[in-house]
UniProtKB/Swiss-Prot annotation:
TM annotation in the entry: none
Disruption phenotype: Leads to enhanced fungal virulence, with faster decaying on infected fruits.
Function comment: Secreted LysM effector that might have a role in sequestration of chitin oligosaccharides (breakdown products of fungal cell walls that are released during invasion and act as triggers of host immunity) to dampen host defense.
Keyword Signal: yes
One MF annotation (Gene Ontology) recorded for this entry: chitin binding
Keyword Signal: yes
UniProt-recorded name of the protein: Secreted LysM effector LysM14
Region of interest (Disordered), ranges: 185-220
Signal peptide feature range: 1-35
Disulphide bond pairs: none
Other facts: In plants, chitin acts as a microbe-associated molecular pattern (MAMP) that is recognized by lysin motif (LysM)-containing plant cell surface-localized pattern recognition receptors (PRRs) that activate a plethora of downstream immune responses.
Gene: LysM14
Comment block on domains: The LysM (lysin motif) domains are small globular domains involved in binding chitin in eukaryotes. LysM14 contains one LysM domain.
Length: 384
């Protein structure tokens, strides 16, 4: 019995389909076999995890720094990155707050290669020590504890806070106090107190006095007999007073951290500078790209991912801040970009009040206000 042309076509189609299925199954089994043998089938670099190249320090010589995630252990990291737990212990000896592999905790930094030790993770509310946001790396890593010191009468605790009680000043348990430790006297010297007349005592918009003028004698500086009140927006940028002049106090530093969430939580701006009530500058958050921190510059950084990464303030989209923490100085907030009176939305209160938001009652700018620009300064006294 002969096959009709129709049946021949159908049989040929079935045969071709079986061949295609056979080829696909062969490829699948080959892929599984190579994956199980440790050879990556689809790796663009031709290497599997088991053949990972050794990690190396970055361009600045800092070790390859990894952020501990939930569930991480040194053993798991050693297996994942083809090193040993002994390597990890050795590479991290002397690192800030390193507890050893047995006590690593989520959020900490750990070296997974040789190289210089990294700066510790920034703590949003820290006011002393190396974990104050924006702190620069010292020349000597051993100087970390002395960075951002507290006033001479206070101790700096591992939490980044200043105080005089035992939980700030005692070195037991180990690590409670990191700098200027030991009992502190509560008696304050009258000579150490300074007073100024320029600090406003009301909650109205801030006004400041003009810069003191000098007399005809070059060796003395006298105050003007009549203070001329001006608004912050009328200040012209002028160089700060010469620090070598004995009759002028050193330039003070202001610093503020502005958060996207209440309670000083979430991503944040960190701004600091050296302006006083006479030398005023306008920081436009959406445009600012000045990130250099020094004894003379004004900087503004945007910290994301819980303070692990930073960029320029211009890289942030935050316009409705919910809380802030001011370390020192005072800031006036404007909705626009020109720091002008008609855009005024509020100003900060003293640093002693800690984290300030709508719940504490200390957040002067209303919750729905747009933070477009800042004008910050530290009050400075001029003595004769």
């Amino acid at each position: 019995m002969g096959w009709s042309p129709r049946w021949k076509v159908m049989l040929r189609g079935i045969f071709n389909a079986m061949i295609s299925i056979h080829i696909l199954l062969s490829l699948l089994f080959a892929h599984i076999a190579t994956a199980q043998s440790g050879r990556s089938f689809g790796d663009s670099h031709g290497h599997s995890l088991n053949k990972r190249a050794p990690l190396a320090p970055d361009g600045d010589g800092i070790c390859y720094t990894y952020t501990i995630q939930e569930g991480d252990t040194c053993a798991k990291l050693a297996q994942r990155y083809q090193v040993t737990t002994s390597n990890i212990e050795t590479w991290n000896v002397g690192s800030w707050g390193w507890p050893g592999c047995a006590k690593i905790k989520q959020g900490d930094f750990v070296c997974l290669s040789s190289g210089a030790l990294p700066m510790p993770v920034a703590l949003p509310n820290a006011v002393c020590g190396p974990q104050v946001p924006g702190t620069r790396r010292p020349i000597k890593y051993s100087d970390l504890a002395s960075l951002n010191p507290c006033p001479s009468t206070q101790c700096c605790a591992i939490s980044g806070q200043c105080g005089t009680l035992s939980n700030f000043c005692d070195v037991s348990p180990l690590g409670s106090c990191i700098f200027n430790c030991g009992p502190k006297s509560t008696t304050k010297s009258a000579a150490s107190k300074t007073t100024t007349t320029s600090n406003p005592t009301t909650t109205s918009k801030t006004t400041i006095t003009s810069k003191p003028t000098t007399t005809s004698k070059p060796t003395t500086i006298s105050k003007t007999t009549k203070a001329v009140m001006v608004t912050l927006t009328s200040i012209q940028m002028v160089p700060p007073p010469d620090k070598t002049t004995a009759s002028v106090a050193p330039t003070a530093t202001w610093q503020i951290t502005i958060y996207e969430k209440g309670g000083c939580k979430g991503d944040y701006y960190s701004a600091q500078g050296h302006e006083d009530q006479i030398v005023g500058g306008c920081i436009v958050l959406a445009d600012n790209t000045d990130t250099k921190i020094s004894d003379t510059t004004t900087s503004c950084r945007w910290w994301s991912d819980g303070g692990l990464n930073w960029g320029t303030c211009a890289s942030s989209k935050l316009v409705n801040a919910r809380s802030f923490f001011i370390k020192s100085g005072k800031c006036v907030i404007y909705s626009g970009k020109k720091c002008q009176n008609e855009d005024w939305v509020g100003e900060t209160y003293g640093a002693f009040k800690g984290c300030q938001d709508g719940n504490t009652g200390y957040l002067s700018p209303r919750k729905d206000a747009k933070w477009g620009s800042l004008q910050c300064f530290e009050y400075k006294s001029y003595t004769t």
